[in-house]
Structures are given as C-alpha cells and as structure tokens.
Swiss-Prot record:
It comes from Homo sapiens (Human). The gene is PNMA8C. Residues 182-204 have a biased composition (Basic residues). This is Paraneoplastic antigen-like protein 8C. Disulfide bonds: none annotated. InterPro entries: PNMA, PNMA_N. Residues 135-204 are annotated as: Disordered. Belongs to the PNMA family.
Length: 204
C-alpha cells in the first residue's frame, strides 16, 4: 500500500516524540473523538493479533481531520504480509499507516516528488490504477428479440432466423392404400369418358 508524504511524516514525527522505533510501529488514523481507550483496544485486538504482541504507545488529536491518531508499538518487526491496511472501527474505516521497507523509501520519495510536480496525490494514482486494473464488471448482453416468419416461395430466410414449420405426420399403410385405390379408380373413369367421347365423334 502506498502512503503520502504527510502520512509517513506524521508517523515519523509521532514515533520520534514517543521515542519508539518507527519501523516497529503502526499509526491508526480516523479514530472518532468519542471512542474511549477500552473500545479502541477491543477493536484493534483481533486485526493486529497476527503481528504479535503490541501496545498503544500514545494518541494525538488531529485538528485538520477532526479525529484522533494512535501510535501502536510492536515487539517484533513488521510482517508486511499480514499487516492490515484498514480496520473497521467505530464511526467508519480506520486507516493503518506503517513505514515501508527500507529499500522502498528511495523509490517512494521519488514517486511522491513526481506526483507533487504533476499536482497529483498518491490517492489519485491509486484510484486510476484501480480503474485500469479492475474495470467495472458488466453483465452478459442480451440479443434483441427478433420476429421470425416463414419465407414465401423463392425467398431465403434471414441469417440467424429460426423458422418454425408445422410437421405433417406420415400416412400409415391403410391410408396409403385407400388413396392409391382412389387414384386408380379415377384413372379408370377418365379412360371410360375418353372412349365415350370418341364413340360420339364417330356417330357424328
């Protein structure tokens, strides 16, 4: 997590005033004025438990933020893998500030100087990175409904359109035979009619 110059400077200033090692300390910001000491210790107990033993070294009221800040002294070096970035506390989310690794200080110093020259803050950069790396998820798009009709003779169905046609059930054997018989009788009648026509022509 990246912190601004003000956050790091405030942590160093607090640790220097309390004579504690800044690389073995945390600073918690955003504590409301009406949060007493017992409530505060109960809230931070579980989130800071993975860091080992700790104690509250001191607190200060920040006029600019209208809230309190607390310096937490650890007995062991900061475990960067488990240190919380935020704590859900009374009145909202409390920010946790800690000193970055020593090899990262030079990089962060240059980064902060660059952001200042551009009129930007660390928060601005973090917001842009979140937008670029984690774009808002969009649900699956639904295709618009299309009306499909059976094409006429000589017409081709549109691409992607599904054509529903009524299926005529096949004829069984009895129906086939009956229709075949009707067809034969019809042919015989036609032959007889032709013969009659020929006979009448001869008489004339």
């Amino acid at each position: 997590m990246l912190f601004g110059v003000k956050d790091i400077a405030l942590l160093e200033h607090g640790c220097k005033a309390l004579e504690v090692d800044s690389y073995k300390s945390l600073m918690i910001l955003g504590i409301p004025e009406d949060c007493n000491h017992e409530e505060f210790e109960e809230i931070i107990r579980l989130p800071l438990k993975p860091l080992g033993k700790f104690e509250v070294a001191g607190k200060a009221y920040l006029e600019e933020d209208k809230s309190k800040a607390a310096i937490i002294q650890l007995t062991e070096d900061i475990n960067y893998a488990v240190v919380p970035r935020e704590i859900k506390g009374k009145g909202g989310v409390w920010r946790v500030v800690y000193m970055p690794r020593k090899q990262d200080i030079e990089f962060l110093t240059k980064l902060n100087l660059f952001l200042q020259s551009e009129g930007r803050t660390v928060e601005d950069m973090a917001r842009v990175l979140r937008q670029e790396l984690c774009p808002p998820a969009t649900g699956p798009r639904e295709l618009p409904a299309r009306k499909c009709s059976v094409p006429g003779l000589g017409e081709k169905p549109e691409a992607g359109a599904t054509v529903q046609m009524d299926v005529v059930p096949p004829l069984d054997s009895s129906e086939k035979e009956s229709k075949a018989g009707v067809g034969k009788r019809g042919k015989r009648k036609n032959k007889k009619n032709r013969r009659r026509h020929h006979a009448s022509d001869k008489k004339l």
